[in-house]
Amino acid sequence: TDRIPEFIALAEARFNRLLRIRAMEEKQTASTVAAQRNLALPTGFIQMRNLQMNTDPIRPMQYVTPEIYDRLYGGSVSGTPEMYTIVADEIQLGPIPANVQTIEMLFYKKFDALTAVDTTNWMITNAPDVYLYGCLLEAEPFVMNDPRVQLWATAFQQSIKDIQEQDNRDRHSGSALRVMNTSGYY
């Protein structure tokens, strides 16, 4: 029983790698610093969905690879950021901000970890089966060749699949999908 917190942490790491659902989305704003290109990634960051300058009008920022970023903005060009890349735990803005501006990030964030103090989160409330089967899978090396391990693996994979599919259905419910020309909006 001493290892149960370890099994929980390992199960959380596993489903944080597998899922990208609305319950994991977080929106935060940050202020740029004049003449400084880097911003720290938010705590719990997994993956960016959208990054924009909150100007009037709002200006979406384009992601580029670090290599392209270095070719375009490797020097000291300053102005209003239009592009960004992610290196290690930082967002690099290009061109380098000439003044203080507000950016808004929509990103996937890890679920809050369960602890002795924080005993609930979205996953344990809405999909406790993911925790159960994930913890059983992580405990398997210690229970030594339990014949139910394949059952646990299948149940875990099915639970993850069900959550992702439900989120996909919910995300696009309410109206028909359609192609939209957004060129006049920017």
Located regions from the model:
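Glycine-enriched, solvent-exposed interface loops adjoining structured elements
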Residues: 1-186
